[in-house]
């Protein structure tokens, strides 16, 4: 008899819940249309649902009529976007994750103190673009270990590093180790820039990997943290697939013996996970479902002041 082990925590984090609730509350308070700068979170199911309810997702503020309402996505924005919104007389609401905002604030602070900032992350990811924009003359983005060797700073340059919140813990450990070897005096935040939810989901999955022969990560291909979960399994030689709906689960699984793990990215609704489990039960009728709880998450972020009762 085969088992599917559900890695827990999985799915929505506090920042994603807050961002979605911001859009829902804005639609309820002011009605459609409500404009959202970038996809509120990187998940097609969430975005499509909000679009049906009256949210309009845009990349350029010029697509919003003057005086309109705009919500900034959970990933954050560079300061010039806020300035443009002000110039266009837009009513803006910030749904940036609280933990991303913390990194923005740290980058501004240390840049003002004369530090060069090393930002570990993916250059094209919207979160990194937003953080970089806080101090473009002081920030250098590092994507991989090899980039550390190419940094132009002298050994005595005051250096401060932060990371994108959704990176692989494995990658961050390798890059920060290389950074500290080359620049022993580099400093960072007292706690990791990788958010609690990213850490919990990766560590929860790691804990079940010795018991399984295959992993499904339920998440969107655009989702950074979902892709990193897939990599956690693959680094440990466990076949893994990133799926965003039950339609993506094929009878390929019948070619593998042993138990299966399922986890989900931080922007994945739990109902999609349950649909994927149902699909697996169709393929493997005697499949047993087991929940594996690694940590209990009780983090809640308050809504922006514009939407508080």
Curated annotation (Swiss-Prot):
The keyword NADP belongs to this UniProt entry's keyword annotation: no
Annotated binding of [4Fe-4S] cluster, by residue: 13, 97, 195
Superkingdom of the organism of origin: Bacteria
Cofactor(s) required, per the database record: [4Fe-4S] cluster
Recorded catalytic activity of this chain's protein: isopentenyl diphosphate + 2 oxidized [2Fe-2S]-[ferredoxin] + H2O = (2E)-4-hydroxy-3-methylbut-2-enyl diphosphate + 2 reduced [2Fe-2S]-[ferredoxin] + 2 H(+); dimethylallyl diphosphate + 2 oxidized [2Fe-2S]-[ferredoxin] + H2O = (2E)-4-hydroxy-3-methylbut-2-enyl diphosphate + 2 reduced [2Fe-2S]-[ferredoxin] + 2 H(+)
Annotated keywords: 4Fe-4S, Iron, Iron-sulfur, Isoprene biosynthesis, Metal-binding, Oxidoreductase
Family named by the database record: Belongs to the IspH family.
UniProt protein name: 4-hydroxy-3-methylbut-2-enyl diphosphate reductase
